[in-house]
């Protein structure tokens, strides 16, 4: 073997070997336990970042170790290839999105292969491939048949720059999440999926502490996020009546303004109602009020997420309209509020300022009456300032509420529901925050929705035999909207499946979350042209703990930023596929790991014009105070900036650490890292620096340390290669029994340390605590390097055994180096390639100690330690303790009154 560690040669040779063997192609094998681990598929943006490296290395370590333990493992990979970034890149570079996407896929695939990932590339998919998205379209048609998919017109968030609909979560401070353009409200038709039909089941399986919860292998934080997003609320839905008539002379909404509340016990405290800007009553009032019309237009530009509405200033205008309180008959004024969403509930809320903090602030701002109707013993109510107890329903009882007086919350709600039901104006109801999933997107680069529009027959589904509806690959967006609308080729030859007349295709495409809602199942049957999923999915997605039901994939890995939308949609999609008889599982992912972000230092300065520009860490050095704390930064190299060339020593602002980002110039290019140090170093560093679920703060010095560690391992292997290893390897490989080897004291000590660490490492692998796996490997190499008793009985066998264990422990993290040393030192000749070598077993005999150390105390005070035989009885321990020099020194010749022995721990001489 080479004398010095050359990562380029080592990694090239290992990858060539695995490629020649087709080492990671996997088939279904009923004779082995299966394990399916999958990382969230990446968007082909052009290059991998360190977050990708960390995610995929976690997956790789998991599957490599389990393969050694006899599992049939699957680690696939694909590309989430549709979406707006490709269109925008195409617009900028004047090339079709398909060309940009496939070029990026090719480059990123090479990067993954350079990482040495154990991916079965025979199962590779790209969601922009017609062979893949055909099944998006097929299942959409099935949902249409079952009534799960439907078409409706609804007010949506419209990004005027990207010219597409945005989900509420994609609107930030009233602007599009990607373009930053002010978002408009538009009413347009689109297709929706009835995820709300599955709301209860989606909640049951994820609910923390719920008796039907199955996703106990998910982080509690993610489960709570989904639980809150689904948002089940129990309360009362009721109507305020009115006789407000529209242009047609009929009462608007049949003369009823419906609201939902979880605090029906405060109904007697209603002093106003607020409706959403798009509510029919608001629009009716705005028709004769320019001021109100202008306010409504302004509201359309605001943020639409609940989180944004919670923090923005509450504003409103009175409509001049009044509705009737259903229990008191009092007239209640209707306001338009910028904090009311038309898409939630009925687009209206009752205002109870005395007992709702938001309503209290609104009433104080606009001088609306505040009426107390609940009380808590020992508390005094004031309209001057809000106090938390005003909204307390646990201790509250009703006052000033007629026949509700004296009732606690639950009883009062029941009574109100009874009174409203008697009037035909309300009932108890369960509501959900969850809304049906709008899947129509007004953009080109996505799955075509398989609908044909006929002037006579309307919207008609494309016959299944005509799938896929293929997206043109050669269109280049010009910024003027969806190019499918103008593409004659896309519509050429299209006829209505009902009447046969010439027709046009639907030009909306599907939300890209559709693509990522089931790709992990397609990996299981990636080349099946006849079925969406088949036997492969039945094998890989089966629950190993039950014949049917339960969860499928064994381990899913990805960022917590996908906790709600992607994971919720994937769960819904799986349940739909189950109900259509395509799969047998209730949930897609048995266990979920949300890996932490990779962070790095951020450096910036303001230009002469006030803009902020960022600097690469490699060009900056820190300034420290006397305590060693970073207090600033300065350039250590000349750097071009908007203000010209900045000299060395220029002061730079230090912003602390944050997520690696292209925009902040604080990312690390994995390719440069691999070229300089090797893939094994990159992998080892990302695993060692922090537990997988925690953030990783980048440290160049620690990267160097990881490289030096690998060099130590290689150098020790080179040292062993000078020994006659044949016989020792045979013993380690089982060709000869270790029971026949006589180990001396030093060899036994080495084996004790190696097997003790191995026992902990085994536990750490089970917990996916890979940082402590690596630290265990470091303890092993320390023990091996410290071993000097080469003439000791069994020394050679102990060394070879210990190094073989180390290589297998390290192999999942640093497969190239482990492969090279395993082969060069002869282990492979007896145990096969390291990727298929059996996982090392802890030898119970190695953990048996001939001697143990006991703490020595005199009169309860620590005076040293003694070595005794592990089988020594109390009398023997007493004899050794009393003969100890330190014991004699501190007893000063006195006869001990007694000697206390705590087995395995200490001996205390009392004088």
Curated annotation (Swiss-Prot):
Localization of this protein: Cytoplasm
Name of the featured protein: Leucine--tRNA ligase
GO molecular function, a single term: ATP binding
PANTHER family reported in the protein's UniProt record: LEUCINE--TRNA LIGASE, MITOCHONDRIAL, LEUCYL-TRNA SYNTHETASE
Motif ('KMSKS' region): 659-663
Binding, ATP: 662
A Pfam short name: tRNA-synt_1
Organism of provenance: Delftia acidovorans (strain DSM 14801 / SPH-1)
UniProtKB keywords: Aminoacyl-tRNA synthetase, ATP-binding, Cytoplasm, Ligase, Nucleotide-binding, Protein biosynthesis
Entry superkingdom: Bacteria
Motif 'HIGH' region, residue range(s) on this chain: 42-52
InterPro entries: aa-tRNA-synth_I_CS, aa-tRNA-synth_Ia, Leu-tRNA-ligase, Leu_tRNA-synth_edit, M/V/L/I-tRNA-synth_anticd-bd, Rossmann-like_a/b/a_fold, tRNAsynth_Ia_anticodon-bd, Val/Leu/Ile-tRNA-synth_edit
GO cellular component: cytosol
Entry keyword ATP-binding: yes
Lineage: Bacteria, Pseudomonadati, Pseudomonadota, Betaproteobacteria, Burkholderiales
Enzyme class: ligase
Enzyme nomenclature, EC number: 6.1.1.4
HAMAP family (alphabetical): Leu_tRNA_synth_B
Catalytic activity: tRNA(Leu) + L-leucine + ATP = L-leucyl-tRNA(Leu) + AMP + diphosphate
GO biological process: leucyl-tRNA aminoacylation
Family, per entry: Belongs to the class-I aminoacyl-tRNA synthetase family.
């Amino acid at each position: 073997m080479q004398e010095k560690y050359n990562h380029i040669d080592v990694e090239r040779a290992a990858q060539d070997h695995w490629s020649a063997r087709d080492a990671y192609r996997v088939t279904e094998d009923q004779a082995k336990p299966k394990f399916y681990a999958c990382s969230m598929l990446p968007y082909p943006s052009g290059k991998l970042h360190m977050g990708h490296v960390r995610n995929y290395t976690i997956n790789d370590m998991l599957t490599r170790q389990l393969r050694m333990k006899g599992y049939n493992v699957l680690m696939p990979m694909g590309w989430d290839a549709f979406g707006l970034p490709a269109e925008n890149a195409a617009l900028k570079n004047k090339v079709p999105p398909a060309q940009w996407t496939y070029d990026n896929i090719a480059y990123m695939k090479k990067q993954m292969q350079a990482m040495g990932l154990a991916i079965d590339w025979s199962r590779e998919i790209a969601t922009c491939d017609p062979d893949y998205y055909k099944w998006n379209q097929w299942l959409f048609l099935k949902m249409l048949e079952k009534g799960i998919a439907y078409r409706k017109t609804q007010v949506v968030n419209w990004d005027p720059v990207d010219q597409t609909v945005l989900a509420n979560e994609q609107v930030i401070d009233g602007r599009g999440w990607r373009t930053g353009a002010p978002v408009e409200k538009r009413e347009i038709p689109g297709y929706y999926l009835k995820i709300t039909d599955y709301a209860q089941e989606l909640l049951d399986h994820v609910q923390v502490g719920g008796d039907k919860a199955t996703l106990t292998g998910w982080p509690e934080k993610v489960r709570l996020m989904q639980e809150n997003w689904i948002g089940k609320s129990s309360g009362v839905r009721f109507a305020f009546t009115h006789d407000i008539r529209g242009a047609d002379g009929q009462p608007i909404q049949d003369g009823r303004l419906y609201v939902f509340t979880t605090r029906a016990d405060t109904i007697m405290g209603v002093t106003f109602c607020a409706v959403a800007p798009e509510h029919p009553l608001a629009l009716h009032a705005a028709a004769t009020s320019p001021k109100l019309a202008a306010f409504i237009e302004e509201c359309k530009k605001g943020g639409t997420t609940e989180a944004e509405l919670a923090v923005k200033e509450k504003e409103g205008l009175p409509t001049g309209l009044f509705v009737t309180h259903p229990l008191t008959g009092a007239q209640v004024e209707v306001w338009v509020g910028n904090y009311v969403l038309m898409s939630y509930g009925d687009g209206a809320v009752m205002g109870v300022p005395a007992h709702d903090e938001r309503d209290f602030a609104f009433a104080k701002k606009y001088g609306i009456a505040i009426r107390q109707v609940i009380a808590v013993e020992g508390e005094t109510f004031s309209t001057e300032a809000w106090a938390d107890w005003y909204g307390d329903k646990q201790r509250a009882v009703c006052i000033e509420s007629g026949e509700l007086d004296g009732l606690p919350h639950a009883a009062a709600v029941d009574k109100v529901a009874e009174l409203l039901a008697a009037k035909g104006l309300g009932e108890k109801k369960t509501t959900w925050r969850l809304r049906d999933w709008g899947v129509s997107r007004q953009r080109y680069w996505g799955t075509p929705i398989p609908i044909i529009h006929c002037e006579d027959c309307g919207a008609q589904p494309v016959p299944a035999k005509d799938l896929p509806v293929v997206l043109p690959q050669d269109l280049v967006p010009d910024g003027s909207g969806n190019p499918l609308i103008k593409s004659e080729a896309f519509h050429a030859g299209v006829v209505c499946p009902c009447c046969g007349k010439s027709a046009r295709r639907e030009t909306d495409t599907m939300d890209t979350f559709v693509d990522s809602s089931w790709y992990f199942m397609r990996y299981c049957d990636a080349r099946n042209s006849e079925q969406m999923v088949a036997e492969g999915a039945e094998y890989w997605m089966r629950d190993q703990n039950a014949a049917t039901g339960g969860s499928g994939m064994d381990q899913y890995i990805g960022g917590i930023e996908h906790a709600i939308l992607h994971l919720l949609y994937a769960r819904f999609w799986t349940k739909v596929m189950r109900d259509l008889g395509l799969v047998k599982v209730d949930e897609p992912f048995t266990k979920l790991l949300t890996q932490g972000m990779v962070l790095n230092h951020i450096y910036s300065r303001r230009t002469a014009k006030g803009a902020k520009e960022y600097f690469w860490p490699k060009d900056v050095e820190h300034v420290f105070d006397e305590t060693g704390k970073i207090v600033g930064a300065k350039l250590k190299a000349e750097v071009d900036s908007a203000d010209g060339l900045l000299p060395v020593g220029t002061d730079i602002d230090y912003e602390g650490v944050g997520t690696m980002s292209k925009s902040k110039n604080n990312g690390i290019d994995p390719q440069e890292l691999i070229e300089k140090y090797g893939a094994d170093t990159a992998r080892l560093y990302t695993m060692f620096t922090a537990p997988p679920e925690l953030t990783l703060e980048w440290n160049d010095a620690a990267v160097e340390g990881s490289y030096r560690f690998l060099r130590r391992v290689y150098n020790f292997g080179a040292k062993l290669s000078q020994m006659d290893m044949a016989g020792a390897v045979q013993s380690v490989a089982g060709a000869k029994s270790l029971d026949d080897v006589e180990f001396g004291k030093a060899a036994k000590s080495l084996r004790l340390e190696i097997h003790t660490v191995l026992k902990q490492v085994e536990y750490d692998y089970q917990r996916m605590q890979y940082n402590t796996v690596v630290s265990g490997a470091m303890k092993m190499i320390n023990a091996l390097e410290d071993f000097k008793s080469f003439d000791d009985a069994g020394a050679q066998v102990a060394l070879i055994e210990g190094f073989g264990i180390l290589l297998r422990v390290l192999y999942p993290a640093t497969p190239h180096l482990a492969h090279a040393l395993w082969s060069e030192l002869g282990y492979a000749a007896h145990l096969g390639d390291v990727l298929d070598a059996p996982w090392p077993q802890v030898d119970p005999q190695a953990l048996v100690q001939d001697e143990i150390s006991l703490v020595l105390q005199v009169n309860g005070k620590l005076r040293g330690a003694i070595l005794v035989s592990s089988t020594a009885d109390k009398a023997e321990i007493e004899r050794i303790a009393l003969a100890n020099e330190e014991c004699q020194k501190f007893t000063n010749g006195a006869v001990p009154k007694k000697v206390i022995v705590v087995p395995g721990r200490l001996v205390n001489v009392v004088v």
